[in-house]
Amino acid sequence: MLSITLSEVLNQMNLKMPSDEGVLNFELTGFSSLDQAGPHDVSFWTGDKVSETGLAGNAGGVSASAFAYVHAGLLFVPSLYEKYCIDGRSELLPNVRFVCPVENPYHAMVTFMREFVERRETFDGPRIASSAQVHASAVVEGVVGENAVIGPNCVVMKGAVIGAGTVLEANVTVYPRVTIGEDCVFQAGVVVGPRGFGFYEFEGKRRMVPHLAGVRIGNRCSFSANDVVAAGFISPTVIGDDCHFDTFVQIAHNCVLGNNIFFASQSGVAGSVTVEDDVEFAGGVQSAGHLTIGKGVKVAAKAGVTKSLKAGKVYAGYPAEEIDVWRRSVVKLRMMGKK
């Protein structure tokens, strides 16, 4: 858990200090995305870099009225919004303790994560329940619950939590900031919580995004051999209850999966995809990032999802479309090919 003051952050990042010294000792204890941030969290908003809408109007998918519900301890915003801020406060963001205009809010957030999370965050020492079974070759630095089984050559890093009755079979790696629920099964080679594949541009250079928000997995989930679940940036990658994944499945950073989801072998989702309850992916299905897969959707094998899918439908093909439309298209193409 973090415990830092606003003064420490502003000093370390060479940011403008407020004239109100009383706010400098305000405690910051976490970080999160704008929609989930709490009163002591650090977050950011990129705004509209072209015009001065956004805080004063509508930009970046956020309306002015929505900002009334934003809670944060420290919020990085674009420097062009400095005119709306007086000594770290803004009437447009009444529930944000300190609004901090910066040149590049995304880079500021990355800098904060590297300086205060990656380098300073501490975790409690290992704690293994008396009923847990841990193989002699395993390395456990995190928390292991009652009746859990940690198999040969598994690694449970500091800050990881393994729930009661969960089984890591062999060569499973669980990174820091990962919480796994009860009665889950992880086959050989599964990796949970590594840095995702994310980059951003700043000052003419492409830079890596630190994914330090970890992963949260619910109860009764199963992961087959060599699956990978990447950590989120400032909000965790989330998988609900009763989800089951075949071999070689990839769940990218910042994805949010609901309950009762089934992915067959070699399927996967790119970053920031929302998968609602009861979704099924057949083998080899791949989804582009920043989409929503609606409740109860089924996607046929080898399909490529390039846009959000409506709930309750069956899809196929590339780009994925409703399966009846896809079938008619395939028939027409075959008929044209015979002429």
Report the location of each language-model feature:
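Terminal amphipathic alpha-helical/low-complexity segments used for targeting or macromolecular assembly
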Residues: 1-131, 183, 189-190, 194-208, ...
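Structural signal for interior beta-strand "rungs" in well-ordered beta-sheet cores
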Residues: 44, 127-322
